[in-house]
């Protein structure tokens, strides 16, 4: 294991050195992330090289790419991953007043800093990260924006194929085994294993948005025609096997239509404060599992936030969320989040705090830490994340994320 890590470190150094030769086109960062899980008493490590490439062929045509090379000992099945996060051709004004991007894209909709209910084109890895909000995976897409004038634009997104969130097979089986085992145990049936079959949609995904700048704020309305990125159980069938009962589980991806409204601008009455908000009205495909509807009626999800920097350099971001990232339908509930960073005068230290509270069961998530900037290009952040609440509470279900986090980042 140590030898493999050393080889990978050498490869990373070679790649970074090669990139520096083409300094005009390449940029990126090298990040180490370590988590010490307090309950399991183990340390996991991730080394991430993110290379960004930009090359202009003409004033109107350029190519851009974002390649991620990641090594992690969290996954023994696939510790080394090479991920082309983005790679696309960008044409600007080749067609008058039209900007077109085509290739593997990350499409960001919504004005919120995190957990926007309008941001639905790109899947994310399993789990919810409170330390890295930029984990989305690229998808094959075309993004065309037509500028009607200096303050109004019309944007259209087209994905020829639906790309769901990826969950490792063994991890997915464990999730559904723990989900359905109690139900069958109550009937006197012991489930020993799970077989999973996915039914993927064969229709494209698309969306359209029109936005406009006003005197003190920007606003946009949008429509998304696509699917839920995470699978829902569709068929559940216990089958006798040679070594016990096997659960044959069919998973599908319900369709959904999302009508959205987003805005960003000055907060009334507080100079320098910014108000952001996203509102989604979601119409799901009715989805029935074992005689009960997992999805049926239309519902709302929303995020509203304010950020402000005080005269003594304290940055505050306060947000209200109705419907967390993992909640859909009648499971949606209210949360409050706060993010605070204090820049100290004549100091390279920056203390920070991230907190969230469920307004339904009052469970809490807290992350207390500090960053140290050795230079403009290199920094280290140490934080401690802990949960307050019962295991069945909203945040109590996330006890596995508790621990110490160390992140070192070098930009080049």
Name the predicted role of every residue range.
Residues 340, 398-412:
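Outer-membrane beta-barrel "beta-signal"
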Residues 224-226, 264-357:
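Detector for outer-membrane/organellar transmembrane beta-barrel domains
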Residues 55-59, 93-95, 148-150, 213-216, ...:
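Outer-membrane beta-barrel strand-turn architecture
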Residues 54-166, 170-174, 212-215, 389:
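Outer membrane beta-barrel
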Residues 24-26, 59-64, 97-100, 151-154, ...:
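Repeated loop/turn-to-beta-strand initiation elements of outer-membrane beta-barrel proteins
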Residues 41-47, 80-85, 136-140, 202-206, ...:
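Residues that define the transmembrane beta-barrel architecture of outer-membrane proteins
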Residues 34-40, 71-75, 108-112, 162-168, ...:
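Gram-negative outer-membrane beta-barrel proteins
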């Amino acid at each position: 294991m140590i030898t493999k890590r050393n080889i990978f470190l050498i490869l990373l150094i070679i790649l970074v050195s090669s990139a520096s030769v083409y300094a005009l086109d390449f940029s990126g960062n090298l990040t180490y992330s370590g988590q010490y899980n307090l309950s399991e008493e183990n340390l996991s490590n991730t080394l991430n090289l993110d290379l960004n490439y930009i090359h202009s062929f003409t004033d109107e045509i350029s190519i851009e790419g974002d390649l991620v090379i990641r090594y992690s000992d969290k996954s023994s099945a696939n510790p080394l991953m090479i991920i082309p996060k983005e790679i696309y051709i960008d044409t600007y004004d080749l067609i008058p007043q039209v900007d077109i991007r085509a290739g593997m894209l990350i499409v960001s909709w919504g004005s919120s800093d995190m957990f926007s209910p309008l941001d639905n084109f790109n899947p994310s890895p399993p789990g919810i990260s409170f330390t890295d909000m930029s984990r989305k995976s690229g998808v094959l897409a075309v993004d065309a924006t037509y500028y009607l004038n200096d303050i109004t634009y019309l944007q259209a997104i087209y994905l020829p194929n639906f790309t769901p969130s990826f969950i490792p097979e063994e991890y997915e089986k464990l999730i559904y085994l723990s989900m359905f085992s109690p139900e069958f145990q109550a009937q006197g049936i012991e489930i020993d294993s799970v077989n999973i079959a996915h039914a993927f949609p064969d229709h494209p995904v698309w969306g359209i948005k029109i936005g406009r700048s006003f005197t003190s704020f920007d606003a946009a309305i949008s429509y998304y025609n696509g699917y839920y990125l995470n699978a829902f159980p569709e068929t559940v069938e216990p089958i006798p096997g040679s070594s016990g009962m096997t659960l044959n589980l069919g998973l599908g991806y319900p369709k959904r239509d999302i009508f959205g409204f987003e805005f960003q601008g000055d907060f009334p009455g507080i100079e320098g404060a910014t108000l952001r908000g996203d509102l989604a009205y979601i119409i799901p495909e009715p989805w029935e599992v074992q005689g009960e509807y997992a999805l049926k009626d239309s519902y709302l999800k929303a995020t509203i936030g304010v950020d402000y920097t005080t005269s003594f350099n304290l940055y505050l971001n306060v947000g209200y969320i109705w419907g967390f990232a993992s909640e859909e339908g009648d499971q949606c509930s209210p949360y409050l989040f706060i993010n605070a960073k204090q820049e100290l005068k004549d100091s390279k230290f920056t203390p920070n705090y991230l907190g969230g509270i469920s307004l339904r069961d009052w469970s809490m998530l807290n992350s207390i830490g500090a960053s140290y900037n050795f230079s403009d290009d290199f920094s280290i952040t140490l934080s401690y994340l802990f949960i307050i609440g019962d295991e069945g509470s909203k945040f109590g279900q996330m006890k596995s994320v508790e621990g110490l986090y160390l992140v070192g980042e070098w930009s080049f």
